[in-house]
């Protein structure tokens, strides 16, 4: 069993490795078996490294939630236009885009794009509605108001503040012009994602439980006083930071946590101050919880089982990408669990990035967009190979 001191030493390493694993998983080419083999090699490398620092996993007792069936097989090919209705597209400032090797989160608030990404370490960058660079929020460093790596962020719309999470134990607050205000340290809990909604901050441990009593979701007021915590962590588990781009998603008055380990969606409802599992994915051959959260067994058994890759909830739609057998599938369904579109997808599915509003963002480089005919065609004439990141603001079909 890993003791608490050892956990504190390895937590940053786990975050770094799992972030790199997330990037590998989210850029899988999902059609051919040869591409599946590439995915397998990538997953093995990431999970093997993580297995060197982790051990001990155990299943927890959870509520059932409404079933979302992914049991059907299909030979149908799905195109992006069947899943997303693009509302707008902007090309990010070329100089700034060149500094972004990856993008992990996007939001659009009051005419500004907030983009979390970087070369090696994450940084929060702002752009105007046309993609012109405005400013960085905070700097990378160790001084007051600086962060080693921005892991996640949230926009506090009530108090006009920007909260940046430096996992696992610090949140930095800035005003909307990037002026540093204050920071909050968490001594005994490891957090990996943050959201703001209804004047509350919601932080998730992503099943990274150090103590048996740790919870999955913690709710704080505007001054970061703890209000309550919900949903038991999987006991004695060292869970990796979630491989989804945005596992913690604002959904109107609710906040959803997407958990591929337990194959569920957990919903925090601020109006009733409660959280529970609201949905449960059903797969033909699901990976057991104990294998999913233990990196070594995940690497050894990933070929044998089906598992969730990514998901986003947007109003009355749920979009899921998942491995089933030897192939990658997507399934767009209603909240009642009725499938609208599902099958293989013949394009590299970008990360599904849920903003705080009713939008899903896709970040695609110009050359990738032009290379693949399956992407939205109506913007082709406006793009060239030298364009960096293109940000598509979409609704689910």
Question: Where are the regions that the model predicts?
Answer:
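Short beta-strand elements that form the blades of beta-propeller/WD-repeat-like
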Residues: 112-117, 160-166, 199-210, 251-266, ...
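Short coil/turn segments at the loop-to-beta-strand junctions that recur within blades
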Residues: 96, 138-146, 186-192, 233-238, ...
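Conserved blade-ending motifs and adjacent loop-strand segments that build the rim/top face
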Residues: 278-300, 335-357
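Blade-loop segments of beta-propeller domains
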Residues: 93-97, 132-159
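Asp-box/WD-like beta-propeller blade repeats and closely related beta-sheet repeat scaffolds
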Residues: 167-198, 203-211, 230-235
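Blade/loop signatures of beta-propeller domains
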Residues: 60-92
């Amino acid at each position: 069993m890993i003791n608490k001191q050892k956990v504190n030493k390895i937590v940053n390493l786990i975050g770094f490795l799992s972030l790199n694993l997330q990037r590998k998983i989210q850029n899988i080419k999902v059609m051919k078996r040869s591409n599946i083999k590439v995915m397998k090699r990538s997953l093995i490398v990431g999970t093997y490294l993580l297995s060197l620092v982790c051990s001990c996993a155990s299943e927890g007792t959870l509520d059932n939630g409404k079933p979302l069936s992914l049991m059907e097989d299909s030979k149908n090919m799905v195109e992006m236009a069947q899943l997303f209705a693009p509302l707008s597209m902007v090309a990010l400032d070329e100089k700034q885009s060149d500094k972004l090797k990856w993008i992990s989160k996007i939001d659009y608030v009051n005419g500004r794009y907030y983009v979390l990404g970087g070369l090696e370490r994450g940084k929060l960058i702002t752009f105007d509605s046309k993609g012109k660079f405005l400013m960085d929020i905070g700097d990378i460093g160790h001084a007051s108001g600086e962060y080693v790596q921005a892991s996640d962020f949230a926009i506090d719309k009530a108090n006009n503040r920007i909260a940046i999470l430096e996992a696992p134990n610090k949140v930095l607050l800035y005003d909307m012009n990037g002026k540093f205000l204050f920071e909050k340290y968490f001594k005994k809990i490891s957090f990996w994602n943050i959201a703001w909604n209804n004047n509350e901050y919601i932080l998730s441990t992503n099943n990274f439980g150090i103590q048996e009593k740790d919870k999955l979701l913690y709710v704080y007021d505007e001054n970061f006083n703890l209000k309550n915590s919900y949903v038991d962590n999987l006991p004695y588990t060292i869970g990796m930071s979630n491989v989804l781009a945005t596992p913690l998603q604002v959904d109107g008055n609710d906040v959803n946590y997407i958990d591929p380990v337990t194959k569920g969606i957990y919903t925090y409802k601020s109006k009733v101050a409660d959280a529970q599992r609201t949905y449960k994915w059903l797969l033909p051959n699901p990976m057991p919880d104990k294998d999913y959260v233990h990196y070594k067994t995940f690497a050894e058994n990933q070929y044998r089982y089906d598992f969730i890759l990514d998901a986003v909830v947007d109003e009355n739609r749920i979009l899921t990408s998942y491995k089933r057998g030897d192939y990658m599938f997507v399934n767009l369904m209603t909240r009642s669990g009725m499938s609208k579109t599902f099958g293989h997808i013949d394009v590299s599915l970008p990360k599904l990035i849920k903003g705080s509003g009713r939008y899903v963002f896709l970040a695609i480089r110009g050359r990738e967009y032009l290379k693949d005919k399956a992407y939205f065609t109506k913007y082709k004439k406006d793009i060239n190979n030298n364009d960096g990141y293109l940000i598509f603001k979409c609704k689910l079909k």
